[in-house]
Each structure stands twice: as structure tokens, then as C-alpha cells.
């Protein structure tokens, strides 16, 4: 999941599609100036050839406009993949990034914004099964994500509460303070 990158750089966490996807994504909102790279280090257990899939979307395709203002690249160990992402479909989908050779151990992964105009990256999936195509829609995607992330089928019971405050914005802080005084 892109939101778990160690360093977000100039990319920001956007949660507007949580209902569709079940998680937030990284957004490169630079007002026309490319933002600083997001980066993380991944551990590869077995050296070899991997297919790279990037879950993204071209946010202007829905209006049948030409060009893709939210373009970005994915770099492994400082080298960009041949594909440019955020250029194919209006809906969230897995865009094929081609194949790459990876070494055992630490490998640096980066998102490089090319435009500063809202590139979107939800997740990156690597597979040594070069013909594997990750699911794009609904329940199949939810099951795939849960299995890849090692999450349980049913969430752990967190107990019973009178009030749960989600978010630390002004409204969330006010609600938490008021609840603490009751």
C-alpha cells in the first residue's frame, strides 16, 4: 500500500476514495510543480525477475480530455521503469509496469511525480509469477488485499465503547474534548 511508504516526500495522503478502495492513496498535489519523491525500502527474499503492477488512475479521462496531467514514474534502486503511470484509465486499475530484476535484500522504491498535477498511487504489487494479473474490482480486490497484507477475515473485537472519535481535525478534537468532560 502506497500510504505505508517510509517517506512521503511531497506526496500527501488522500482518503477521498476510502469507500471505493478500502484504503487511502498517495497524491502528488504540487500546483503544477513536481513534488519531492516518496520513497521506501522493500525487502526481497529471492532475487529474480518480477512483474510490477501499480494501482492508479488518470483522473481527467472521465471527461474525455487529451493528456494525462497526473503522470508519475516508479523507480527501483534509482532506475525508472519504462512505463509512465496515471495515463491509462479513468477508473482505479492495476497498470502494468513491466518486469524488473531485483536483488535479495534491501531495494529502494520511489514515486517520482512528473507534473505536479495530482498523480495518484494506491498500491504497488510485485509478483514473480509473471502472468498473474491482480483483480481490479469489488469483493475480489478486497479479498486480494486482505490476503496480501495478511489481515484476518474478521477484524479483532476492540470491545465496547460509548463514543469513538475518528480523525484528529478540529471537529475530532472538539468531540474528544467534550466527551472527556462528560
What are these regions (language model features)?
Residues 180-182:
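Glycine-rich FAD pyrophosphate-binding loop
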Residues 1-155:
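Extracytoplasmic
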Residues 176-177:
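Generic hydrophobic/aromatic pocket-lining and core-packing "Φ" positions
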Amino acid at each position: 500500500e502506497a500510504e505505508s511508504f517510509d517517506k512521503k516526500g511531497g506526496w500527501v495522503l488522500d482518503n477521498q476514495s476510502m469507500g471505493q478502495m478500502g484504503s487511502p492513496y498517495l497524491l502528488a498535489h504540487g500546483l503544477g510543480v513536481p513534488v519531492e519523491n516518496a520513497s521506501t525500502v522493500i525487502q526481497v527474499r529471492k532475487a529474480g525477475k518480477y512483474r510490477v503492477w501499480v494501482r492508479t488512475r488518470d483522473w481527467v479521462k472521465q471527461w474525455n480530455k487529451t493528456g494525462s496531467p497526473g503522470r508519475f514514474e516508479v523507480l527501483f534502486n534509482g532506475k525508472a521503469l519504462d512505463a509512465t503511470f496515471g495515463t491509462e484509465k479513468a477508473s482505479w486499475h492495476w497498470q502494468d509496469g513491466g518486469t524488473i530484476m531485483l536483488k535479495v535484500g534491501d531495494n529502494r522504491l520511489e514515486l517520482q511525480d512528473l507534473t505536479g498535477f495530482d498523480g495518484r498511487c494506491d498500491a504497488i504489487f510485485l509478483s514473480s509469477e509473471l502472468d498473474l494479473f491482480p483483480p481490479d474490482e469489488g469483493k475480489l480486490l478486497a479479498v486480494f488485499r486482505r490476503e496480501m497484507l495478511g489481515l484476518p477475515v474478521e477484524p479483532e473485537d476492540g470491545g465496547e465503547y460509548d463514543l469513538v472519535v475518528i480523525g484528529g481535525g478540529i471537529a475530532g478534537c472538539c468531540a474528544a474534548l467534550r466527551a472527556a468532560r462528560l
